[in-house]
Swiss-Prot record:
NCBIfam families: guaA_Cterm, guaA_Nterm, PRK00074.1
Function: Catalyzes the synthesis of GMP from XMP.
Gene Ontology, cellular component aspect: cytosol
Residues where ATP binds: S232, G233, G234, V235, D236, S237, S238
PANTHER family linked to this entry: GMP SYNTHASE [GLUTAMINE-HYDROLYZING], GMP SYNTHASE-RELATED
Pathway note: Purine metabolism; GMP biosynthesis; GMP from XMP (L-Gln route): step 1/1
Protein's name according to its UniProt entry: GMP synthase [glutamine-hydrolyzing]
Organism annotation: Prochlorococcus marinus (strain MIT 9312)
Residue ranges of domain Glutamine amidotransferase type-1 in the record: 13-204
Assembly and oligomerization: Homodimer.
EC class of the enzyme, as a word: ligase
Residues spanning the signal sequence: none
Amino acid sequence: MSQTSLKKERDPSILILDFGSQYSELIARRIRETNVFSLVVSNCISIEEINDINPKGIILSGGPNSVYEKNAPKCDEKIFNLGIPILGICYGMQLMVKELGGSVTSATKKAEYGRAPINIDQESELLSDVEDKSIMWMSHGDSINCLPDGFNKIAHTENTLHAAISNDRKKLFGVQFHPEVIHSEFGITVIKNFVYGISSCVADWTTETYIEETIPRIRDQVGNKKVLLALSGGVDSSTLAFLLNKAIGNQLTCMFIDQGFMRKGEPEFLMNFFDKKFHIKVEYINARERFISKLKGITDPEQKRKIIGEEFIRVFEEESNRLGPFQYLAQGTLYPDVIESAGTNIDPKTGERIAVKIKSHHNVGGLPKDLQFKLVEPLRKLFKDEVRKLGAALGLPDEIIKRHPFPGPGLAIRILGEVNNEKLDCLRDADWIVRDEIKKAGLYNDIWQAFAVLLPVKTVGVMGDKRTYAWPIVLRCVSSEDGMTADWSKIPFPILERISNRIVNEVVSVNRVVYDITSKPPGTIEWE
């Protein structure tokens, strides 16, 4: 089927031009939370491309540069004459001011970082229902010195004269603060005012409409060809399996490679769930001994990751040739993966990477270029929280939708040092106890990750009046919104006590449990 015959994908209602901000992705997420579809695109997008998309509104993101610097990122200045509402955030506001004849200078002496109360100077549609003196999040070292003609100052702070500006006639607006950040008290109100009140968007980005639009596109793309999916049991690949099964049925084959590093009972649960309960075709590949033999004598974590990734490739290639031929490879690529791998080199029309290549999935580790698959990536425009909602709508249980993140190399990188079957059995039992007690306490859904780590040392203990010399287990529990930063979870002592007592009494070769109270940064969530 030719590419031109495929069903057209929906265009974003709001375009976000990325100038290098750490918050560009967050802006898109906040807008989607209001049920409006948005995409992050390059700041170099052409006027022709914008007109082709015909968005209802445009947001210019923040960025680390100063607009008065040589080679500072810009956009086509004709964008301000399209008649499309525009909101500039931080750098985006300063760029708009400079391009339209105003001036921006360094605010070294009055730089503003963190929380700051804003003072509203005059009524504006942008700041409707925003309380005066409310707290907004500032992060800037430059400030506006002079506004362009037609603009008004609508808010200020103690150190920033132009905290918000507007040109109502041209529907051009700017804020020096970051409304997308959770610390901004009325930030979501500002976003809704721009998206709904100013840009007249419609709340039509829902899980139901996504399913209705995506299934026909999958059928158009695939036709009657066969599709292969590497199933890990995580929320991404599981949701994708359900979506593809709904779209193309038995044209889908899932391959589950059991490398021996999964948590207790997971392989059995996944096979029973997908194959027996929902009758989704899953090929189970038992490669446990193959993987464990490759790690003999290996202690370096990066070597372990590399070996596991390379062996996965070999197994995947062998089994796909045996089971195939397959014309399509399905991947659980998400929108953050697209943004990260492409930077701002994203096709503004499709939201895809401009130079498409097979992505290094967390379980695949980079597939061979000569596999000659065409890609099916129906989740590539979704964020993680949207995938969870999609999974729920498709019938996935909470056991999968709300499961904690789990690294591709699995328990192999939660065993520090060399990996062997004895250590794997020990860690599986300890890890199961951790999660079991966290669930019994009703804390599982409040914690980002809770797991056990096995250290490559032994400690002295006393059990039954006898000296012991056994492994210590580290308990790692963290709270986070996205995994980028994390704080150690303040689990009540009685729960920690139960976990410790059970591990030292029920797990062979363990005589000590310690609790990791390190945040990220400076530490990472995983130990390896």
